[in-house]
Amino acid sequence: MTKVVYPGTFDPITKGHLDILVRAAQVFDQVTLLVLSNLQKKSLFSLEERVRLAKSAIEESNAPSNIIVDSYEGVTVHYLEEHGIRLIIRGLRAVSDYEYEIQLFLANKYLNSQVETVLMPTSLRYQFVSSSLVKEMVSFGLDVSEFVTPTVERALKEKLEVKQ
């Protein structure tokens, strides 16, 4: 069985993330969406909220059943080692993503030479979508229904109203 991990902060999960996730689920036997705690980023949603939103988004998207959601507070490579997984999948939107992903690939290879990274370009309609962009759009009252699922959109509106 070929297992792959799709790691990220997913703050929140977008349809761009779901695009990569669903396409990966068509290629691999099991895909774990790994919601990470990242000390370098100040998250709008807590780790638990991001996991809940990811699960809801996957359900709302009628995604394949070979997708599981997990969370981790640590280095992705350590999670892989703990679960006997060797593959990471990452989405690419632009050339700038590629440069960042190569840095992550090299760091992961340094930590564990057995870990491989698969880079998958995002579908054209989501090339510009990011969690940061979606949060900014919601904060300005703009419609983001093309970029996130209804549950995520509601959660963003609720969370950002509290913050204002």
Curated annotation (Swiss-Prot):
Belongs to the bacterial CoaD family. The record marks H17 as: Transition state stabilizer. Keywords: ATP-binding, Coenzyme A biosynthesis, Cytoplasm, Magnesium, Nucleotide-binding, Nucleotidyltransferase, Transferase. Pathway: Cofactor biosynthesis; coenzyme A biosynthesis; CoA from (R)-pantothenate: step 4/5. It is found in: Cytoplasm. GO terms for cellular component: cytoplasm. It is an enzyme of class 2 (transferase). Substrate binds at T9, K41, T76, R90. One of its GO terms (biological process) is coenzyme A biosynthetic process. Its cofactor is Mg(2+). ATP binds at T9, F10, H17, G91, L92, R93, E101, Y126, Q127, F128, V129, S130, S131, S132. NCBIfam families: coaD_prev_kdtB, cyt_tran_rel. This is Phosphopantetheine adenylyltransferase. Its EC number is 2.7.7.3. InterPro entries: Cyt_trans-like, PPAT, Rossmann-like_a/b/a_fold. Homohexamer. It catalyses: (R)-4'-phosphopantetheine + ATP + H(+) = 3'-dephospho-CoA + diphosphate. It comes from Coprothermobacter proteolyticus (strain ATCC 35245 / DSM 5265 / OCM 4 / BT). Reversibly transfers an adenylyl group from ATP to 4'-phosphopantetheine, yielding dephospho-CoA (dPCoA) and pyrophosphate. It comes from the Bacteria. Gene3D superfamilies: HUPs. GO terms for molecular function: ATP binding; pantetheine-phosphate adenylyltransferase activity.
